[in-house]
Amino acid sequence: MNYFELFGLVEGFELDTRQLAETYRQLQTQFHPDRFATAPEWEQLAAVQRAAQINDAFTTLKAPLRRAEYLLSLRGTELRGEQQTLQDTAFLMQQLEWRERLADLKGETDPERAIKDFRQEIRHDHQLLMQQLTQALATGEDPRAADCVRKLKFVDKLLEELERFEDSLFES
């Protein structure tokens, strides 16, 4: 089942999130397992399965990276669970610099300010990568879009690590 079709959306990266949420609520109401409590067992099971599909579809489509991965999979490029590394030397160097900078935050005299500045820089790069991803998907440049997804996953993990580091500063 195509998630875009399930929600009555045009297949593409950019979508109307309000329409997605509204259709989700309608589908949840229509296929909620409680509505089938007095139905035969096979119908109850079908309702539970349909509700799970609706939830999976919504979770996938509402998150931009998951939506991009799903869209690429519909086009024949599977990214989930892959172990492929990036061949972009400049981005690999950027990763090393970011990792080094994250490690150096511990020695900063004003770690709160350093974290804020670092987060702002990473978010800016994230925004640029999202723009590149949007353009690549719109123009059918799937290999380029796949690379953007890989890079964005790294950036998201880095932001999570930065959050954990910041939390650890305030726990001490």
From Swiss-Prot:
The keyword Chaperone applies. Keywords: Chaperone. Residues 2-74 form the J domain. One of its GO terms (cellular component) is iron-sulfur cluster transfer complex. Belongs to the HscB family. Co-chaperone involved in the maturation of iron-sulfur cluster-containing proteins. Seems to help targeting proteins to be folded toward HscA. Interacts with HscA and stimulates its ATPase activity. This is Co-chaperone protein HscB homolog. The lineage of its organism: Bacteria, Pseudomonadati, Pseudomonadota, Gammaproteobacteria, Aeromonadales.
